[in-house]
């Protein structure tokens, strides 16, 4: 079935230098006061990608309607912005260029970036509390940025909300899955710690 997915699913990988540059910033993500804020640590920024450059638009509020997000729909969520050195890094520019080229985005396209780390604070921690879902965009990218002391967290993709997943994979360091969010649904398996009382995150 994957031969029918050329335009809806693309798999690639960041350069080793981009991963090495970006990965340390994921250890400095803040908790939030939102419903998932104790285990989904996050920064969020909206940028414009123009002439190959990342331009910070200083937008840090995010909302999804409840028909898209059954967990936190119709809630305006304010997040701390992605730190300037990270946002202006060559690694972030590489991500945006990759995303723009793969999806044939117009020059100057706005791109919303969620920088997130998920900690296994429960026996089983839900990576995606909303379950099988879409995010409300035409295109999205999921990028693996490191795993420590966890199992689970497999990305699962679906052709429709009620079908079994046709794709399942743990995204390893720097691996990128780009998908047509308006055509596919996604979810992830829960994560759990391998060694208790040790630092855990994905």
Predicted ranges, named:
Residues 1-114, 121-124, 160-170, 189-190, ...:
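Fe(II)/2-oxoglutarate oxygenase catalytic core
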Residues 39, 105, 133, 147-149, ...:
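A generic structural signal for short, solvent-exposed coil/turn residues
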Residues 46, 140-142, 176-178:
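Conserved hydrophobic/aromatic beta-strand scaffold that supports enzyme active sites
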Residues 109-114, 119-172:
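Catalytic core of non-heme Fe(II) oxygenases with the double-stranded beta-helix
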Residues 148-151, 176-180, 191-194:
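Low-complexity, flexible helical/coil segments
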Residues 155, 188-189:
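Short amphipathic alpha-helical leader/targeting segments
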Residues 170-185:
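Conserved metal-binding segment of the jelly-roll/cupin
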Residues 200-202:
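Conserved small/polar residues in nucleotide/adenosyl-binding loops
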């Amino acid at each position: 079935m994957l031969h029918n997915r050329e335009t809806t699913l693309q798999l690639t990988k960041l350069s080793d230098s981009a991963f090495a540059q970006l990965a340390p910033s994921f250890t400095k993500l803040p908790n939030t006061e939102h419903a998932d804020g104790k285990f989904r640590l996050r920064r969020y920024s909206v940028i414009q990608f123009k002439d190959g450059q990342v331009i910070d638009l200083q937008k840090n509020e995010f909302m999804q309607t409840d028909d898209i997000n059954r967990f936190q729909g119709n809630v305006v969520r304010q997040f701390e912005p992605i730190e300037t050195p990270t946002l202006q890094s060559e690694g972030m520019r590489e991500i945006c260029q990759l995303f723009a080229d793969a999806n044939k985005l117009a020059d100057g396209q706005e791109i919303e970036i969620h920088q997130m780390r998920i900690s296994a604070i429960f026996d089983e921690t839900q990576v995606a509390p909303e379950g099988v879902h879409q995010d409300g965009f035409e295109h999205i990218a999921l990028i693996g940025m490191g795993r420590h002391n966890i199992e689970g967290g497999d990305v699962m993709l679906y052709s429709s909300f009620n079908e079994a997943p046709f794709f399942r994979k743990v995204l390893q360091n720097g691996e990128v899955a780009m998908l047509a969010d308006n055509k596919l649904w996604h979810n992830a398996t829960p994560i759990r710690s391998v060694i208790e009382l040790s630092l855990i995150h994905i």
